[in-house]
């Protein structure tokens, strides 16, 4: 990304300045090229095994963890022919490289550009933001621009103003129900859509937009390394491998494990302003959670009666919050049980970590030995 949609500033310079501030802070350690190999413990006492870029292993003891791995983009199907269909990120790079010069594609001037939205992800508004932002820049460079969309999403802050600005500069907007038909026409591409201003479908005529370039939003996907990270951290994934599916019981920045937070596009593709808002929200959540150095559960938590536990691992497998483990119980163990089992003073039994328990009650309902109860 090279341009903000809501202010005239270079994204890369802004990002570079932020990186310099972080790397120059005395209380922040930056480990470039490092990988998380293992994460044990719970809120306030995590144990993270890190492998550095030099191949050495290092153990960290964070009180909380924030995941902000982002996502990757994949080209849309219509761009697979390698012709004059490009992605929005490629168009943004082209405009950044052209600077004050006229826009050119492979040595040929670009006079007409058509943006096609909602072919990949209908629920993501970042495509609309990027399209209108780039359309304004192209129009200022003397290009004729059209935006074809099923539904324009201008709910982001400042987007309605940018939309009106784009229309004022001459950007054309078209709505469609059926996906546009693309065909090669001479040295350009013809984009055919029905005229949606006519109410009767059978009376609609076809509008043909001859374009030097067609820009299509890419598909966003979870990074394969993020999948491995979720396995190590025991985090749940939603559709497409993104971290955490929508859950009305959790805030956007919360994960299924207490003390582990999410920010940015690792959960859902979004614009910079939304990622910054989530980052500020994470800061406040971490401060509230760790304030005073003591965490007191506000909801009922599960408790295991060790002598009744059959060590069947049902609760361990079913717990969505990784709050249950199997511990050794005995006189010398901190989790001691007064009774004996089969004449042995040492045995294994499940144990619920109160700091990690959300009180959902799944383990209580599924325990075949009825060894788990909820208490306040």
Which stretches of residues belong to each language-model region?
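Residues forming the flavin
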Residues: 1-376
């Amino acid at each position: 990304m090279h341009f903000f949609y809501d202010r005239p500033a270079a994204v890369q310079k802004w990002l570079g300045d932020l990186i310099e501030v972080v790397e120059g802070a005395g209380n922040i350690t930056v480990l470039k090229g490092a990988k998380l190999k293992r994460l044990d413990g719970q809120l306030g006492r995590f144990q993270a095994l890190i492998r550095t870029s030099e191949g050495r292993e290092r153990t960290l003891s964070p009180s909380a963890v924030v995941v902000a791995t982002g996502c990757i983009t994949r080209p849309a199907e219509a761009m697979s022919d390698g012709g004059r269909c490009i992605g929005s990120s490629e168009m943004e790079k082209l405009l950044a490289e052209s600077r004050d010069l006229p826009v050119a594609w492979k040595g040929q001037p670009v006079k007409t550009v058509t943006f096609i939205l909602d072919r990949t992800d209908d629920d993501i508004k970042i495509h609309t933001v990027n399209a209108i932002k780039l359309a304004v820049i192209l129009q200022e460079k003397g290009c004729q621009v059209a935006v074809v969309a099923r539904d324009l999403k201008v709910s982001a802050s400042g987007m309605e103003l940018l939309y009106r600005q784009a229309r004022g500069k001459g950007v054309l907007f078209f709505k469609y129900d059926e996906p546009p038909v693309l065909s090669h026409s001479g040295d350009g591409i013809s984009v055919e859509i029905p005229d949606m201003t006519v109410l009767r479908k059978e009376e609609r005529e076809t509008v043909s937009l001859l374009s030097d370039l067609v820009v299509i939003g890419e598909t966003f996907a979870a990074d394969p390394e993020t999948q491995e990270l979720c396995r190590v951290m025991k985090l749940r994934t939603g559709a497409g491998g993104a971290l955490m599916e929508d859950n009305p019981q959790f805030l956007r920045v919360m994960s299924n494990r207490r003390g582990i937070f999410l920010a940015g596009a690792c959960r859902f593709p979004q614009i910079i302003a939304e990622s910054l808002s989530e980052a500020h929200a994470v800061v406040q959540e971490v401060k509230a959670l760790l304030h005073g150095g003591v965490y007191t559960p506000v909801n009922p938590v599960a408790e295991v009666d060790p002598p009744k536990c059959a060590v069947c691992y049902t609760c361990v497998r079913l717990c969505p919050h990784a709050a249950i483990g199997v511990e050794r119980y005995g006189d010398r163990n901190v989790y001691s049980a007064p009774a004996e089992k089969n004449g042995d003073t040492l045995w294994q039994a499940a144990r619920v970590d109160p700091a990690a328990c959300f009180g959902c009650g799944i383990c209580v309902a599924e325990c075949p030995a009825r060894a788990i109860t909820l208490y306040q």
